[in-house]
Design a protein with these regions (language model features):
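Repetitive helical segments and hydrophobic/amphipathic motifs
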Residues: 20-23, 32
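Catalytic cores of DNA base-excision repair glycosylases
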Residues: 43-258
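Cationic, amphipathic, low-complexity segments that mediate targeting or membrane/lipid association
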Residues: 2, 27-28
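Short, positively charged and aromatic/hydrophobic N-terminal segments
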Residues: 24-25, 36-38
Length: 258
């Protein structure tokens, strides 16, 4: 729905107008030819639908970024990816998995040896201890298998909700929506959440998007952020999606870190 309304003033403004739909926000453009033009602003749901459509066009295929062989090697790779790039993890894991690629083998490797291998990923002492300890727990409690259960995964050393979500989605195909600071930032720029932390953003995105889209969309947002909407390369007014969702936005978006 669109309409023209008379008005005046130089500044952008937003207002709710009686249009039969109380959810429509109308944005006022600068006057043109003596007239002020009002056009409907997208609702949050409409923005979500636009994001889903555009990302499907841009990224119809979503390969898992972390190289792995099975749920265990994926779990280890995701743990190593904390505060580290996927590219760096993929350089390190071939050396680690050549030494031990199963819980049975990893549980026998001295922690300091694992630490030396994973040092390029950062936080090596903490990550090495977690990898060896979780391998032992998998043997003791789960018959040497990675559990396909959120609660059981989050009880493993070094495994938080985001890591568990990635494993559930990418190893077992269970609908999940892993949220890191990058997805949190883009969701704020795109007006999909008012969340002050990643937990709130996860709840908002799960409400907005169909459950069957979560696993793929998680990766599509990551790929788009890397290619077009980086932390420093876009301020909410630069990349194609930001411009499409907010064509009249002129002020950079200050995002709240989760």
């Amino acid at each position: 729905m669109s309409a023209d309304f008379a008005g005046s003033g130089r500044n952008w403004s937003q207002r709710r107008l009686t249009t039969g739909d109380p959810e429509i926000l109308w944005e006022r453009s600068p006057t043109h030819g003596g007239r002020t033009i009002y056009a409907p602003r997208m609702t949050r749901k409409q923005r979500a639908e636009h994001v889903l459509q555009r990302l499907e066009q841009l990224y119809p295929q979503t390969p898992v970024p972390l190289d792995h062989r099975d749920p265990f090697t994926l779990l280890v790779a995701v743990l190593l990816s904390a505060q580290c790039t996927d590219a760096r993890v993929n350089q390190v894991t071939p050396h680690l998995f050549a030494r031990a690629a199963t819980p049975q083998a990893m549980a026998q490797v001295p922690v300091d040896e694992v630490e030396a291998i994973v040092r390029p990923c950062g936080l090596a002492p903490k990550k090495a201890r977690a990898i060896v300890e979780l391998s032992k727990i998998l043997l003791q409690r789960h018959q040497g298998r990675v559990p396909d259960d959120f609660e059981a995964l989050e009880q493993l050393p070094g495994v938080g909700h985001k890591t568990a979500s990635v494993v559930m989605a990418q190893a077992f195909g269970v609908p999940a929506f892993p949220i890191d600071t990058h997805i949190h930032r883009l969701a704020q720029r795109w007006g999909l959440t008012d969340g002050r932390n990643v937990q709130q953003t996860e709840r908002d995105l799960k409400r907005l998007f169909p459950r069957q889209s979560w696993n793929k969309l998680h990766l599509q947002i990551i790929f788009y952020g890397r290619d077009h909407c980086t932390a420093r390369g876009c301020d909410g007014t630069v990349c194609p999606l930001c411009r499409e969702l907010y064509p009249r936005r002129r002020t950079p978006v200050t995002w709240r870190k989760g």
